[in-house]
Regions:
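Short coil/turn connectors at secondary-structure junctions
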Residues: 2-5, 47-51, 78-83, 93, ...
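Conserved active-site "lid/cap" helical segment
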Residues: 1-58, 62-72, 76, 83, ...
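Active-site-proximal alpha-helical scaffold in enzymes
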Residues: 89-119, 167-196
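Flexible glycine-/small-residue-enriched beta->alpha junction loops
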Residues: 111-166
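Beta-strand segments within the central parallel beta-sheet cores of soluble alpha/beta enzyme folds
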Residues: 48-56, 83-88, 113-118, 178-183, ...
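Conserved catalytic cysteine-centered active-site region
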Residues: 57-112, 153-161, 224-226
Length: 226
């Protein structure tokens, strides 16, 4: 089977929000559509040239997220005939989407594909497991889907504990971690101040009582960290 060369011709992303921050009321499908639409526009190609759309997503936040890729494709202007599918590889979901999009081109399924990912942990739902058929007797339990996904399904271990285990195994002290974290915050703040990310970011429109505002700068960076 012949494998064709694949090239990245355009990229786009939204600014990153903090947990429970400016993007907490913005649907995940809107975030995905915003990025996909901008990436297509920046490529100089028409939306009907896109032959495949692949989106990574870990935490569905709305019924539309079950077909996030297709919602983003259609709302970004792609024809209804354009194939689309979601992938879930946890933290690597967006990267896997890019790989899958590249494979679609490489093996001749299409000439143009869009690959990316969209996540809104702020909008992660709670599950009421007894709601459909009733609790019948005793207490009912509400499950934090977002927090649950951060746990290993076999050991029931939070991924934060994995970091503690790695630190212990490789003798990484708290001081070393703090130094790296502080330097990371400093670099991110400096990059934002210098405008290094502006060309990457496409603004997200947020409807407020005072009108529409544009969210276009990464929010979580703590510039004052020392």
């Amino acid at each position: 089977m012949t494998h064709r060369d694949v090239f990245v011709v355009s990229t786009a992303r939204t600014a990153i929000g903090t947990f429970g921050g400016s993007l907490k009321d913005v649907p995940n499908t809107q975030l995905a559509t915003t990025a996909v639409k901008a990436a297509i526009a920046r490529s100089g190609l028409a939306p009907d040239a896109v032959g495949h759309v692949v989106m990574g997503n870990v935490i569905p936040t709305d019924t539309k997220d079950a077909y996030l890729s297709r919602v983003a494709a259609i709302d970004a202007g792609c024809p209804i005939e354009t194939p689309a599918f979601n992938v879930n590889r946890l933290c690597g979901s967006g990267l896997q989407a890019i790989i899958s999009a590249a494979q679609a081109i490489g093996y001749g399924d299409c000439d143009v594909a869009v690959g990316g990912g969209s996540e809104s942990m702020s909008r992660g739902p709670y599950f009421d497991t007894a709601a459909r058929y009733g609790a019948r007797m005793g207490d009912a339990k509400s499950i934090d889907y977002m927090l649950g996904i951060l746990h290993d399904p076999w050991q029931k271990m939070h991924m934060g504990i994995t970091a503690e285990n790695v630190a212990e195994r490789y003798k990484i002290s708290r001081e070393m971690q703090d130094q790296l974290a502080c330097e990371s915050q400093r670099r991110a703040a400096a990059a934002i101040a210098a405008g290094y990310f502006k060309d990457q970011i496409v603004p997200v429109e947020i409807a407020t009582r005072k009108g529409t505002v544009l969210f276009q700068e990464d929010e979580h960076v703590r510039a004052a960290t020392t």
